[in-house]
């Protein structure tokens, strides 16, 4: 049965409140939690209507593992993902770990700072504004090549623990849907565990 996603919020204030809400705080988070959550994400993505559904890569890692993350769950939802999805996962994860918020919230904050520009112009300018705001160095000459401010990277937070303990990333859907499918699935998952 097709279950469409509601639109993701674009308001940084609303997004900040959502990310600090008890509805997305895990009571604990282990490899078993990641496995069960990852399968729930896969099922949710496969339930999307064809207008929203695309092959996607789901990756869940424990935070703070440098230089490489400790990936505790990863899978493609269906045939059709490509190696570039892995790059997007890496960059979205880096954004969440550095700033402690979702990659979608980072994008919306940068866009809010470009308020004087019209919608289409703001979207064109967002990557450059991000690089300038945080004085990011680009190893390949491209804008923000270590980070991605596109929806889909989401922090794992645990009740009673300060900071981010892990990162959930979806890559392959439209960026707002990458974000929204994680938020919706985490809320349902945490609600079932409460």
Model regions: which residues?
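Structured interaction and signal-relay segments at domain junctions
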Residues: 46-137
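Sparse, context-dependent recognition of short Cys/His-centered cofactor- or disulfide-binding micro-motifs
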Residues: 26, 43, 84, 89-90, ...
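A generic signature of intrinsically disordered, low-complexity regions enriched in glycine/proline
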Residues: 15, 88-89, 182
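Extended hydrophobic
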Residues: 129-190
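Intrinsically disordered, low-complexity terminal regulatory regions
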Residues: 1-83
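Long, compositionally biased interface segments
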Residues: 192-194
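Ordered alpha/beta subdomains of enzyme catalytic regions
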Residues: 22-24, 94, 173
């Amino acid at each position: 049965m097709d279950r469409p996603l509601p639109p993701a919020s674009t308001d940084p204030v609303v997004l900040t409140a959502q990310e600090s809400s008890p509805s997305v705080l895990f009571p604990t988070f282990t490899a078993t939690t990641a496995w069960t959550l990852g399968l729930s994400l896969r099922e949710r993505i496969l339930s999307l209507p064809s207008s929203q559904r695309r092959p996607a890569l789901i990756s869940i890692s424990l935070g703070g593992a440098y230089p490489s993350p400790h990936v505790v769950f990863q899978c493609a939802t269906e045939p059709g993902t490509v190696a570039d999805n892995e790059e997007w996962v890496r960059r979205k994860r880096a954004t969440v770990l550095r700033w402690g918020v979702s990659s979608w919230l980072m994008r919306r904050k940068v866009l809010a700072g470009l308020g004087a520009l019209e919608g289409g112009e703001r979207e064109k300018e967002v990557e450059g504004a991000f690089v300038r705001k945080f004085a990011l160095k680009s190893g390949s000459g491209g804008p923000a090549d270590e980070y991605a401010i596109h929806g889909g990277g989401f922090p794992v937070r645990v009740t009673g623990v300060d900071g981010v303990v892990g990162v959930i990333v979806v890559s392959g859907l439209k960026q707002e849907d990458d974000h929204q499918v994680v938020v919706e699935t985490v809320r349902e998952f945490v609600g079932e565990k409460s």
